[in-house]
Amino acid sequence: MLHTINYRSWHLAARQLGRSTFRKFTTESSTKSPIADVCFAFDSIDGVLIRGGRGLKEGTKTLKFLQKNNIPFILLTNGGGMHESVRAQRLSKTLSVSLTEDDFCQSHTPFRALADKYKHVLVLGGKDNSVRETAEKYGFKSVINELDVIAKLGTPFWPFTSFNEEDIKDAKDFDVTRPIEAVFTYVDPVRLGLDLQLVMELGQSKNGVLGTVSKTANEGPDIYFSNADLIWPNEYPLPRLGQGAFAICCESVFKELTGKDLRNTKYGKPHKLTYDYAKNILMKKHKTLGITNPPKEIFMVGDNPESDIRGANNYGWTSILVRTGIFQGDNSPKYSAKHVSDNVWEGVRWALSKHVPAAKLNKSMGEVRGFHTSSRVLNTVTKSNNSKPIQRPLRENIFTLPNLLTFSRLLSAPLIAYLYIYDYTKAAACFFLYAGFTDLVDGYIARKFDLGSIAGTVLDPLADKTLMTCLTICLAVRETMPLTLASLIIGRDVLLVSAVSYLRYKSLPAPKTFRRFFDFAIPTTELKPTRISKWNTALQLLLLGLLITEPILPFDASFAKSPLFYIVGCTTIASGASYCISRNTFRNIGKSKLQ
């Protein structure tokens, strides 16, 4: 049974928010009227504004547009474990957008409305002291955590985990006879057994005093959970248990011990209390624009039907589902959104089109222009608390024009070698020129039209190395190229391909099968060519092109071959060494934990 929240707390929260200065929503005049009388809420973790720890250009563009046009928004997430000011700093850097703590509503942000209600509280979750520090910044006067308890009461309180001096170095002394008035779980517990023991003891205590037992088992402190998500996805191929699992453990064990239900309150999406708090912040921002009436419509943009869309629909907000995260498809059959778009920019454009004339909207946002589907990511898990998770590997769209050009260059390598060996020199030269052309344009197209992909960062150098290896062997066999130089070129490429293959195998999510290893739609390791390596590739292609096309050239090219042999030999050695000494040449892109 949920506690009834004292709505005076919301008033106190509004007063507290009022003490801080809200950022102006525009870099122009602060009195400029918004383009539409609406508000937005965005899921701020992977899938809407960022992906795999990197900012999406659609996300940056959207937030800057809303700020410029004085349209209030809030970043509403089930993540937590840190203060909103820390989260704002991190996301500001990731998105290159100026954000403040007032732009965020994390799963535990509504706890700040309860700071005046409780004098002495216990906080749970997280690895370090950040949860306690967050609670103190919210205004809680006396805050203890589980390590304070174990330091005070010793090993007998929880004998199944050993704690050393390093673990409890930040422990805070407290009066064990002082009643604990509330227990707050801010983020997924790291010490689940200890935290479960604490909740059980306090739930059965008399007035929240440790070491006491209530005869009625209903005199304990108020208990709060900030996030009821049962599971969540990370880089591991199967979902991990979340804070919701801890809440279920607490409820089940308490029921078994006492025969009664554990009284507790749950926050986070899709629960109404979190949306109440988020709406309170949006209304405060709305009033700073001098608009006293409520906004005509509030839109929620998310990638998770289970939490984002379900919560928005239940609360009466207009839901927009995007395909840049967990969800991929036409719409969710279980929790259908009012609108589905490829990305957040297109979703916001649709929302504003309901309130802004087309001509005015086109002037503000430009003509309708979609982003390529390669910006989409399929995540590892579709979450549902009521059904088994649908397991999918993290994948991306690899069938883009740059990748197809690169793949054609890869296939042309053995064909060029065959034609050259059997003296079809003109045909070999033509195909070589085609391969060189694709090498020039594929990268340009990827950058110009936002068609880049992780698979492309692997396929492009692989195609170059395959082409050069095939031709180098042919030229060495026909004694057109010195054997020493051919050995240098091939040896460097063999070592480089071996290193990439090894790192891909190590970072490939389970199961590590032969088929999945060669499935480049599953991104794992990104190879970033060094500058000297790019120069070396260009010089090698120049040398190979000269040697391949020499039989059909209208002039004698012998004068250029010897200098190129020496130059290419030196750059080959230097580029090989650069991969060994350069930082961030190989990057594991598979790890993108959702908080």
Curated annotation (Swiss-Prot):
Q: Which Gene3D superfamilies match?
A: 1.20.120.1760, HAD superfamily/HAD-like (3.40.50.1000)
Coarse class of the primary localization is mitochondrion
Q: Where in the cell is it found?
A: Mitochondrion
Q: What is its EC number?
A: 3.-.-.-, 2.7.8.41
Cofactor(s) this protein cannot do without? Mg(2+)
Q: Where is this protein's transit peptide? A: 1-24
Q: Which UniProt keywords apply?
A: Hydrolase, Lipid biosynthesis, Lipid metabolism, Membrane, Mitochondrion, Mitochondrion inner membrane, Phospholipid biosynthesis, Phospholipid metabolism, Transferase, Transit peptide, Transmembrane, Transmembrane helix
Which cellular component appears as one GO term in the record? Answer: membrane
One of the GO BP terms on file: mitochondrial membrane organization
Q: Name one Pfam family in it.
A: Hydrolase_6
Q: Where are the transmembrane segments?
A: 538-560, 564-586
Query: PROSITE patterns annotated for this entry?
Result: CDP_ALCOHOL_P_TRANSF
Q: Which GO terms describe its molecular function?
A: cardiolipin synthase (CMP-forming); cardiolipin synthase activity; hydrolase activity
Report the InterPro entries cross-referenced here.
CDP-alcohol_PTase-I, CDP-OH_P_trans, CDP-OH_PTrfase_TM_dom, CDP_ALCOHOL_P_TRANSF_CS, HAD-like_sf, HAD-SF_hydro_IIA, HAD-SF_hydro_IIA_CECR5, HAD_sf
- To which protein family does this belong? In the N-terminal section; belongs to the HAD-like hydrolase superfamily. In the C-terminal section; belongs to the CDP-alcohol phosphatidyltransferase class-I family.
Q: NCBIfam families in the record, alphabetically? A: CECR5 (TIGR01456), HAD-SF-IIA (TIGR01460)
Protein name per UniProt: Cardiolipin synthase (CMP-forming) / mitochondrial hydrolase fusion protein
The gene that this protein is the product of is: crd1
